[in-house]
């Protein structure tokens, strides 16, 4: 049983490391968005996706290890950490509790930062769309009617020189 606990501790540490890496990538992306470094923001998307895969892998490994410890403790393989930690040897309880709490806290921070970045990127897109619409007015407007159906209204197109002059 001790061996499976040690493996679970290792898996929790790995998961914690992966969340930390993701938070660092999201922090960097946020700085790049604020600095309007479009190329760097674009490159960060691939890194963030790769890190998301690494997190999923670490999470899956941790779940397998948790199920193994649960089985060793004669519990359901779906037993949550809250049920398992009190059943662990006393020497491992504080460590396991701390790792689980740190993972949960870091996950919350990662989610918050991802939401912040999403809002920043969405706002940047809205501003850019507004600029494009001022430079090149749409040939049609889309408006929802009272029934929630989108109506399309055509506009007279103007040549660029007419819009400028």
Residue spans for each PLM region:
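Short terminal interaction segments
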Residues: 80-165
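Extended, charge-rich alpha-helical scaffolding segments
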Residues: 1-83, 87-90
């Amino acid at each position: 049983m001790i061996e499976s606990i040690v493996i679970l501790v290792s898996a929790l540490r790995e998961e914690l490391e992966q969340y930390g890496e993701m938070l660092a990538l999201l922090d960097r992306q946020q700085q790049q968005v604020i600095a309007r470094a479009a190329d760097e923001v674009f490159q960060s998307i691939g890194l963030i996706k790769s890190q998301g895969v690494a997190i999923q892998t670490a999470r899956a490994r941790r779940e397998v290890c948790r199920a193994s410890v649960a089985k060793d403790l004669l519990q359901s393989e779906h037993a949550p950490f809250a049920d398992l930690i009190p059943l662990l040897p006393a020497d491992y309880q504080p460590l396991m509790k701390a790792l689980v709490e740190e993972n949960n806290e870091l996950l919350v921070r990662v989610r918050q930062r991802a939401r912040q970045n999403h809002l920043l990127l969405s706002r940047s897109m809205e501003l850019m769309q507004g600029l494009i619409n001022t430079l090149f007015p749409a040939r049609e407007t889309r408006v929802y009617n009272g029934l929630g159906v989108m109506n399309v209204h055509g506009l007279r197109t103007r040549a660029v020189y007419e819009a400028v002059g």
